[in-house]
Amino acid sequence: MSCKFVLQLLGFWLLLSQPCRARVTKEWLDEVIHVCGREYVRAILDICAATVGLEAPPLRRRRMTEEAVSSFIKEDAEPFDTMPNLSEKPKTALPEGHPSLPEQQQYVPVSSDSVGSLDDFKKSFHATQGEAEDSSLPELKSLYLDTLSRKKRYTSIYMSHQCCFRGCSRRSLTAAC
């Protein structure tokens, strides 16, 4: 073998035998640091860059439910696009004023002279539906998102003050990643 090849092989072996400096140890993560302002942001960026892929994130509740649902699926089940065979015997037609659902049966007028109260009921029912549609999804959604962003903002402000005045571990800062 040539001397150059042996030296290159030795150099390559020495590089591989060196411990990786990019590895994150538990001691490094548990070390308490005091950082304020820009140093706090830089520390978060450094910690997030160093810990990418280090620890698997905890399983979320949604994934657990998906796994539970998939375990109940039968492989020999029929596809959902087929309709079950219904009996060919036609059902007896109900009179037009006769309610078929139990929810409708509780609002049936007692006598024929109470038709006015039925009309009042219909008007009030449609009015309450309109009110329910007025406070619909976009307003509630923005309210929900506002509370989430507010919680995240307060949490990050609290963490920055804690890291500045009392100190915090790098592991606690990984929650911001």
Curated annotation (Swiss-Prot):
Keyword Disulfide bond recorded: yes
Predominant localisation class: secreted
Molecular function as annotated in GO: hormone activity
Domain of life: Eukaryota
Signal peptide (UniProt feature, chain positions): 1-22
Region spans: Disordered: 80-114
SMART domains: IlGF
SUPFAM superfamilies attached to this UniProt entry: Insulin-like (SSF56994)
Pfam families referenced in this protein's UniProt entry, alphabetically: Insulin
Localization, UniProt: Secreted
Keywords: Cleavage on pair of basic residues, Disulfide bond, Hormone, Secreted, Signal
GO CC annotations, alphabetized: extracellular region
SS bonds (residue pairs): 36-164, 48-177, 163-168
Composition bias, Polar residues: 102-114
Family from the record: Belongs to the insulin family.
Subunit structure: Heterodimer of a B chain and an A chain linked by two disulfide bonds.
Function: Relaxin is an ovarian hormone that acts with estrogen to produce dilatation of the birth canal in many mammals. It bears mature young, and allows separation of the pelvic bones.
Name of the molecule in the record: Prorelaxin
Organism: Mesocricetus auratus (Golden hamster)
